[in-house]
Amino acid sequence: MIEDVTADSIDVYEPPSPLEARALTAFAALGQQTRLSILRLLVVHEPDGITVGEIAQAIQSPQNTTSGHLAILARAQLVIGSRQGRSVVYRADLAGVRWLIEYLFADCCNGDPSACRNLFADICTAECSHPSEQEQLY
């Protein structure tokens, strides 16, 4: 038997808020392995950045393909390109990355910042120890 469908029983699509749309764009960009690798490579090369050619060589990808990935990351506000002479040097947009992390954790610990103060205390410190890929599996 088919249930009666009423206007009240149909979920109405609501577009994401501008903040949610920005986060979705960033996660869509990072949801592709090569782009995630590019962002991680650019973080390593902060604050100087590296050229498209250097990125392409490091990730073993054609330069035009790499440029396409960089354009997607730039639209997601995760990388910044700046012209230096005849080259474009790319850097991680650390403000954009920070925004994304802050968006994810905006309501952390029911809005009590003191409860999760140490959540990122070890990031970017000499004591910071990132688990190897094998360790992360268990």
Q: Which residues make up each language-model segment?
A:
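Alpha-helical residues within the helix-turn-helix
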Residues: 57, 74-75, 80
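Short, hydrophobic-biased segments on the C-terminal half of alpha helices
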Residues: 70-71
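Short, Lys/Arg-enriched C-terminal cap helix and immediately downstream tail that follows
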Residues: 77-79, 85-86, 101-103
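N-terminal helix-turn-helix DNA-binding core of bacterial DNA-binding proteins
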Residues: 18-62, 84, 88-97
